Regions:
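Hydrophobic ligand-binding cavity/cleft-lining segments
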Residues: 1-43
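Hydrophobic/aromatic beta-strand elements that line small-molecule binding cavities or substrate pockets
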Residues: 6-8, 61-66, 87-95, 106
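Hydrophobic beta-strand positions in extracellular immunoglobulin-like domains
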Residues: 10, 79, 106-108
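Hydrophobic pocket/interface hotspot
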Residues: 17-21, 27, 51, 64, ...
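Glycine-rich portal/gate segments that line the openings of hydrophobic small-molecule binding cavities
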Residues: 37-82, 96, 133-144
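Short, cysteine-centered beta-strand-loop-beta hairpins and adjacent loop/turn segments enriched
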Residues: 56, 81-85, 110-114
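Glycine-rich nucleotide-binding loop
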Residues: 97-101
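A conserved amphipathic terminal alpha-helix motif
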Residues: 108-144
Length: 144
């Protein structure tokens, strides 16, 4: 099982950080992401909302499974290429001094037919670096 855990404290109010990171368009701050957004048939932002992410060599269809603004939200990959067995991802937002501490945790495996551990050895560092790039872009955009 792969676990990716990244954290960053951003010098901006928790509500602004939450809103920025909960917007699927923020995912385009990742170097490999070409486009991201809610699907045409998605419910409004919140539980049940479905977003699609298209990146170099991959795509994801994710559903927001929990949405507690401005404290946390959780998502689950429903479909993807390459395939993921996703246990879920959660972003947690905690006030920290004059800013917000963001904790992002996701866990997954790849089925053996898709490359299993070999594919995980490739996706783990790629996804981790993209998560960090998204958090860095949030900080660059919002920090006072």
């Amino acid at each position: 099982m792969v676990e990716i855990h990244v954290q960053r404290t951003i010098a901006a109010p928790v509500e602004k950080v939450f809103d920025w990171l909960a917007d699927p368009h923020a995912l385009t701050a990742a170097p490999l992401v070409l486009r991201a957004g809610y699907t045409k048939d998605s419910s409004p932002p919140g539980p049940g909302a479905v977003r699609e992410v298209v990146a170099l060599g991959t795509w994801f269809r994710e559903q927001i499974t929990a949405f507690d603004r401005p404290r946390s939200y959780t998502y689950l990959i429903l479909r993807s290429f390459p395939p993921f067995n996703h246990e879920g991802g959660t972003l947690t937002f905690t006030p920290a001094g004059n800013g917000t501490h963001v904790d992002w945790l996701t866990t997954y495996t790849h089925p053996a037919r898709a490359g299993g551990n070999l594919l995980a050895a490739v996706t783990r560092p790629l996804l981790r670096s993209n998560f960090l790039a998204i958090l860095a872009a949030c900080a660059k955009t919002l920090e006072i």
